[in-house]
Curated annotation (Swiss-Prot):
Its cofactor is heme b. A ubiquinone binds at residue 201. Keywords: Electron transport, Heme, Iron, Membrane, Metal-binding, Mitochondrion, Mitochondrion inner membrane, Respiratory chain, Transmembrane, Transmembrane helix, Transport, Ubiquinone. This is Cytochrome b. The lineage of its organism: Eukaryota, Metazoa, Chordata, Craniata, Vertebrata. The cytochrome bc1 complex contains 11 subunits: 3 respiratory subunits (MT-CYB, CYC1 and UQCRFS1), 2 core proteins (UQCRC1 and UQCRC2) and 6 low-molecular weight proteins (UQCRH/QCR6, UQCRB/QCR7, UQCRQ/QCR8, UQCR10/QCR9, UQCR11/QCR10 and a cleavage product of UQCRFS1). This cytochrome bc1 complex then forms a dimer. It is a multi-pass membrane protein. Heme b b566 binds at residues 97, 196. PANTHER family: CYTOCHROME B. The chain crosses the membrane at residues 33-53, 77-98, 113-133, 178-198, 226-246, 288-308, 320-340, 347-367. The keyword Cytoplasm does not apply. One of its GO terms (molecular function) is metal ion binding. It comes from Akodon paranaensis (Parana grass mouse).
């Protein structure tokens, strides 16, 4: 078997990626989230496949088909809640994965980082179109509000919105195409994830110290396979607790009401994992400005390698930037909270301050703290 895994055309790819891969000996549990994201993707594709067997993408039957899955299909309720809460687990792992990349300076691996940003955007798009499928009140109005933002694009905006809708409003054509997108996008994510891994294995993994670890590598198997398995069991435990005991805690009560174009919910809001971006969107009174801020809130991640002037790798030995980093995380939590609040004082003001702080930390404070720390090293 040893010879086979090293010489077989297919098995040697697996061998170089997951068995004999030279890995830094000191990577911590923060490095577990890559494998957890892979696990989440597998869970989502499998549960999604079984849901798609019973779901109908028609405005008259979509809501009923989801109810039918929960009531009449064997373990349909479990599959549906694993899928819905699996999306939340996916985004928790995703945000921690990105946060770890920022903290430990993984953005210096340019290709891996940029593919990661594409993966983040694709996952957000997949989650958005998936949220529309149950055809509840919040699904319908969320789709209407978010797709309508594209009308802010000069000249082509209105045409683009009607093209995406497949008509003059969110209707049957929209639901059908959103189902098609939601089915194909996870496989595109899987393909991008392989490219992400390919680029990562070209350079090798980063490590907590931020130092070159070429002289201290260990094989991925059995050390990190067992470590990843522990993470996977913990993830599955949390997911099962969510799906079995608190299945609707992260959902919206409005989605228990079938979509009604004549009745608008009091507060239109997306799923919790989009609330930070939604708060940034709402904090700018101008429509086009809000849309640009929304897009930039994710694309600004691409500026980390450009704005990095530090002579040290990662934040482990940089206390000034560490403080700014944790302020940034706290600010993100504030934005998430504000995104779920009604548009009224004082929430609008807090949202505007938090949005300005979000961009200021990345564009101004982190580069300034880098310069300060570089000068301290010279002393």
């Amino acid at each position: 078997m040893k010879i086979l895994r090293k010489n077989h055309p297919l098995l040697k790819i697996v061998n170089h990626s997951f068995i004999d891969l030279p890995t830094p000996s000191n990577i911590s549990s923060w490095w577990n989230f890559g494998s957890l994201l892979g696990m989440c993707l597998v869970i989502q594709i499998l549960t999604g496949l079984f849901l798609a067997m019973h779901y109908t993408s028609d405005t008259t039957t979509a809501f009923s088909s989801v109810a039918h899955i929960c009531r009449d299909v064997n373990y349909g309720w479990l599959i549906r809640y694993l899928h819905a809460n699996g999306a939340s687990m996916f985004f928790i792992c995703l945000f921690i994965h990105v946060g770890r990349g920022i903290y430990y300076g993984s953005y210096v691996l340019l290709e891996t980082w940029n593919i990661g940003i594409i993966l983040l955007l694709t996952t957000m798009a997949t989650a958005f179109v998936g949220y529309v499928l149950p055809w509840g009140q919040m699904s319908f109005w969320g789709a209407t509000v978010i797709t309508n933002l594209l009308s802010a694009i000069p000249y082509i905006g209105n045409t683009l919105v009607e093209w995406i809708w497949g008509g003059f409003s969110v209707d049957k054509a929209t639901l059908t195409r959103f189902f098609a997108f939601h089915f194909i996008l996870p496989f595109i994510i899987a393909a991008f994830a392989l490219v992400h891994l390919l680029f990562l294995h070209e350079t090798g993994s980063n490590n907590p110290s931020g130092l070159n670890s070429d002289s201290d590598k260990i094989p991925f198997h059995p050390y990190y396979t067992t470590k990843d398995l522990l993470g996977i069991f913990l993830l599955l435990l949390v997911l099962m607790i969510l799906a079995l005991f608190f299945p609707n805690v992260l959902g919206d009560p409005d989605n228990f009401t079938p979509a009604n174009p004549l009745n608008t919910p009091a507060h239109i809001k997306p799923e919790w994992y989009f609330l930070f971006a939604y708060a940034i969107l709402r904090s700018i009174p101008n429509k086009l400005g809000g849309v640009l801020a929304l897009v930039l809130s994710i694309l600004i991640l691409a500026t980390f390698p450009l704005l990095n002037t530090s002579k040290q790798h990662g934040l482990i030995f940089r206390p000034v930037t560490q403080v700014i980093y944790w302020i940034f995380i706290a600010n993100l939590l504030v934005l998430t909270w504000i995104g779920g609040q009604p548009v009224e004082y004082p929430f609008t003001t807090i949202g505007q301050i938090a949005s300005i702080t979000y961009f200021a930390i990345i564009i101004i404070l982190i580069p300034v703290s880098n310069t300060i720390e570089n000068n301290i090293i010279k002393l």
